Amino acid sequence: MKRTRLVAATAASTITLAMALTACASDDTEAPADSEETTSESGEVEPGDLTLWVAGGDTPDELREYLVDTFEAENEGSTLTIEEQDWGDLVTKLTTSLPDAENTPDVVELGNTQAPTFTNAGAFREISPELYEELGGDNLLQSFVEAGSVDGTVYALPYYFGSRYMFYRADIWSDAGIEVPTTLAEFGDAVTELRTDDMSGFALGGQDWRNGISWVFANGGELAVKEGEEWVSTLSDENTIAGLEQWQDVYEGASNVPATERDVAYWDFLNDKAEGGAPDAATIMAPGWARWSIGDLTENDEGEEVRDGMADDSKFDIFALPGVDGGVAPVFAGGSNMAVSAQSQHPELSENLLRIIYSDEYQTMLAENGLGPANTEFNSIMETDKFGEITVETAENSKLTPAAPGWAAVEGASVYEELFQKIAEGGDVTELAAEYDETITPMLNGQAG
């Protein structure tokens, strides 16, 4: 559910960072040897000053205040400082700070696609089986648990999830006599028909692989699989190629957005232009929070001009991307994981903070604020309107990127952006798949590409 995504400088730099972490992590990642945390004669943990890093602005102030107040009330004499880190700088900051016991944050939020690299590098303290069960166990979102695990040992837990679905101009679709599609092919036909010189039927940047891989997943394809001890890029798999070719057709037929574009504020495309006339797009694909940037202009309680969150459902509406044969297509799941630094000098206090984060009260607050809770037992809280219902529905059908140790290097080098741009520009998908398989496979296994 990130609003911006990790873009590191190069693959080599990301791999170097992971190697540095590996070198600094011991075989026993449960706690650093020089941990200063002590217990009193009564067995209670001595007070300490804990630092939590949150990524971006998705955790509302209300939730941050709750964490600070509750932690300090339950851990007398201890303090909690919450520091917000920009998504774009997060990997670099984690890599320089996590190995340093003097400067490491104690508990960190990181993206679900970043978690495998850091867990494989030994950056995090193990979540014991007993603590795992206490914090939710198998009710925790399992795809995110897998992203934070190595060989069955859990190091990073789900924090929150978000999903993506289709936002569309219901008035424009209705005027064109087009119904909400029930298959992926019908979707492609519909948005191609809606396209004009001034309006995308479906606004999609050519480099936007995070939306584009939904076509791969819907066709039964994978980005990579683990064969024995090695990860292998599977772009050349026939199902993956089918998905990429279908995405290519949709991009070429429906989008006016340049092939060079990636992180596009698609939500703006649905809104009426200030000067009047048709919007820039009839359809977009975006995370659920995009709703609050879409709609007619109104004033909030402070007198500020804001969007009304799609209040007019005859004008703005949503639907899940349909699958090849109907149902709901698997989409890429956004969201975050939460972990304790292996070098934290306050491991027990850190675990106490986790107990608050995974408490019924905090999970309820996440759901009430539109953030998919880590504990799936609280999903029903979100299902009070169509937005919550579709978030849960699409999340239940979502998929993650491969949990390979080198995945952050692939993302950091913008390899998929490059591949999807070439596909958007009309490149031969089969040839490009073979070429990029050779590039990506060694990177997935922590080797320079």
Identify what each model region corresponds to:
Residues P129-L140, E222-A242, D249, E299-S314, ...:
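Short, solvent-exposed loop/beta-turn-alpha elements that line the ligand-binding surface or hinge
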Residues Y155-Y159, R164, G188-A242:
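Extracytoplasmic/periplasmic solute-binding protein
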Residues S174, E396-G449:
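Conserved C-terminal helix/tail region of periplasmic/extracytoplasmic solute-binding proteins
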Residues G111-R164, W215-V216, A311-F319:
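Hinge/lid segment of periplasmic solute-binding proteins
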Residues D198, L223-N300, E348, L432:
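Extracytoplasmic ligand-binding clamshell segments of periplasmic binding protein
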Residues W267, W289-D308, F332, S336-V410:
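Mature extracytoplasmic/periplasmic domains
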Residues P105-D106, E134-D171, G201, P322-G323, ...:
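A structural signal for short loop-to-beta-strand junctions that line the ligand-binding cleft
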